Curated annotation (Swiss-Prot):
SMART domains given in the database record: IG (SM00409), IGc2 (SM00408)
Domain of life: Viruses
Source organism (scientific name): Vaccinia virus (strain Western Reserve)
InterPro entries: Ig-like_dom (IPR007110), Ig-like_dom_sf (IPR036179), Ig-like_fold (IPR013783), Ig_sub (IPR003599), Ig_sub2 (IPR003598), IL-1-bd (IPR004078), IL-1_rcpt_fam (IPR015621), IL-1_rcpt_I/II-typ (IPR004074)
Family: Belongs to the interleukin-1 receptor family.
Keyword Lipid biosynthesis tagged: no
Locations listed in the record: Secreted
Protein name per its UniProtKB record: Interleukin-1-binding protein
GO BP of this protein: symbiont-mediated perturbation of host process
Entries under Gene3D superfamilies matching the protein: Immunoglobulins
Description of how the protein assembles with itself and partners: Interacts with mouse Il1b.
Length: 326
């Protein structure tokens, strides 16, 4: 045996030993907080979740995908590995998928849970995306979870179906994937289907999403009663009442007062007890009423200013009273 092959073998084994010895230990970052439930026989794209959490100085040399306990021949890395694609998934493709990012000195991994389900009435609540609008408002319904499919084709054609209300002129698709609903009605609620075409390898695949639209009661704006101005005198005991009326579905509000950059809340005096707030809550005529009383005792010259009653709710409201001293 010549000495040359021995030298090459020695170099090969030494190089392999050094690479193995220097390979960084891979940090397991656990499972991604969101699970993915996708339809059978339709393309699935999963993101590598830890990429967006890596520091800007981290130089990724390699992104690897694997399925725990199975072969990886169904996985197609796309977008330079930052996403993985399965073109025609079956229920056997359900499981845990792992994204591994590495460079010369660092390695980490994170897993995602994928469940593939069939389209059936019994599964519709599992695979639908809930969205909420309010009655008598202008709302929007969005074709969900499609960004990865339209990243290279923002003008992708998206077709809506599945609900008779789509023929109503109040429902208009102004932007691909977004339906604007004018003057929302209760019977707009239900299931809507949006389908987009995804092209890969010269072939076209349908990507289907089902939206479960819920229509909640009309939000009736809260009302506030507060006088525009009050006249008082130095040394007197002054109480200013602010009355906030709420209608369902709005049932609660945080009511407080503001004056000259100072906040006054219930059980929170100005330090010497001269200015205090007391709130009382009661029900009347299907309304929840909060009466907030600002008490100033005794009145001083510095109180000749404005006091704003603020109700922090949806939407928030406020009103200002001017105190004058004679």
């Amino acid at each position: 045996m010549s000495i040359l092959p021995v030298i090459f073998l020695s170099i090969f084994f030494y190089s392999s030993f050094v690479q193995t010895f220097n390979a960084p230990e891979c940090i397991d970052k656990g499972q991604y907080f969101a699970s993915f439930m996708e339809l059978e026989n339709e393309p699935v794209i999963l993101p590598c979740p830890q990429i967006n959490t890596l520091s800007s100085g981290y130089n990724i040399l390699d992104i690897l995908w694997e399925k725990r306990g199975a072969d990886n021949d169904r996985i197609i890395p796309i977008d330079n590995g930052s996403n993985m694609l399965i073109l025609n998934p079956t229920q056997s493709d359900s499981g845990i998928y792992i994204c591994i990012t590495t460079n010369e000195t660092y390695c980490d991994m994170m897993s995602l849970n994928l469940t593939i389900v069939s389209v059936s009435e019994s599964n519709i609540d599992l695979i639908s995306y809930p969205q909420i609008v309010n009655e008598r408002s202008t709302g929007e319904m969005v074709c969900p979870n499609i960004n990865a499919f339209i990243a290279s084709n923002v003008n992708a054609d998206i077709i809506w179906s599945g609900h008779r209300r789509l023929r109503n002129k109040r429902l208009k698709q102004r932007t691909p994937g977004i339906i604007t609903i004018e003057d929302v009605r209760k019977n707009d609620a239900g299931y809507y289907t949006c389908v987009l075409e995804y092209i890969y390898g010269g072939k076209t695949y349908n990507v289907t999403r089902i939206v479960k639209l819920e229509v909640r009661d009309k939000i009736i704006p809260s009302t506030m009663q507060l006088p525009d101005g009050i006249v008082t005198s130095i040394g007197s005991n002054l109480t200013i009442a602010c009355r906030v009326s709420l209608r369902p579905p709005t049932t609660d509000a945080d009511v407080f007062w503001i004056s000259n950059g100072m906040y006054y809340e219930e059980d929170d005096g100005d330090g010497n007890g001269r200015i205090s707030v007391a709130n009382k809550i009661y029900m009347t005529d299907k309304r929840r009423v909060i009466t907030s009383r600002l008490n100033i005792n005794p009145v001083k010259e510095e109180d000749a200013t404005t006091f704003t009653c603020m109700a922090f709710t949806i939407p928030s409201i406020s009103k200002t009273v001017t105190v004058s001293i004679t």
